[in-house]
Amino acid sequence: MKYAILLLFFAASVAFAATPTFPLVEVPSAHGTSDTLVVFISGDGGWAAIDREISNVLASDGMPVVGLNALQYFWKKRTPEAASGDLATIIDRYLGGWHKSRVLLVGYSRGADVLPAMVSRLPADAQAKVRMLVLLSPSQKVEFEFHVADWMHNSSAGMPVKPEVDKLGSQRILCLSGQDDHDSLCGELTGRPNVEIVTLKGAHHFDGGYGKLGQIIIEHLK
């Protein structure tokens, strides 16, 4: 019996050690009324004001948020396949841990750029749980690695994002951009029945007013 207990303890320890760790931020909800988990991938500024304020609005509406700090995560080069696998792990872990059945995926800037490729590579059972993708200020191209120079200017390198959106079929998408953000992907997605496009004042950072973005997401989710 003693050896059986030791064996179980050892197995649990190995499983815990093998559990991947990610730069995550948890924003629990005080109201457990929603069946939806939010996974939010930030931009290159890390977990910044826009991510915090939108997450607080979503959590106050009953949807707990787990945020992936893209600055830290993409400091190391990733592949779309590996990033998708990590997203699947996060979704599975938090759906079970927070007792939710569906997921809302939100990305800002680089977070929005990587989401289509990550979602298109998810297992079918995980894709079936996705209520909607929210792309905030998505660009035309994306690299799955952060470079310090990206803080200075937009890079024209990387894989095109639009073909990855095409792979998502009828998946519901909400695309938000500033009217002065001329590099935004949103304009390339007009006319698609599964894509809702919202254009707001400002440019890539929407000129602040981040709480309003959270409310727009909630309105379109209904």
Show the residue positions of the predicted features.
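A short loop-to-beta-strand scaffold at the N-terminal edge of the catalytic core in hydrolase folds
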Residues: 19-28, 36-37
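The feature captures the conserved acid-bearing segment of alpha/beta-hydrolase catalytic domains
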Residues: 28, 143-193
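Alpha/beta-hydrolase active-site loop
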Residues: 77-98, 116-117
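Gly/Ala-rich beta-loop-alpha elbow adjacent to hydrolase catalytic centers
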Residues: 106-115
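Conserved hydrolase catalytic core segment
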Residues: 118-130
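Active-site nucleophile loop of the alpha/beta-hydrolase fold
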Residues: 132-144
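C-terminal catalytic histidine-bearing segment of alpha/beta-hydrolase fold enzymes
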Residues: 195-222
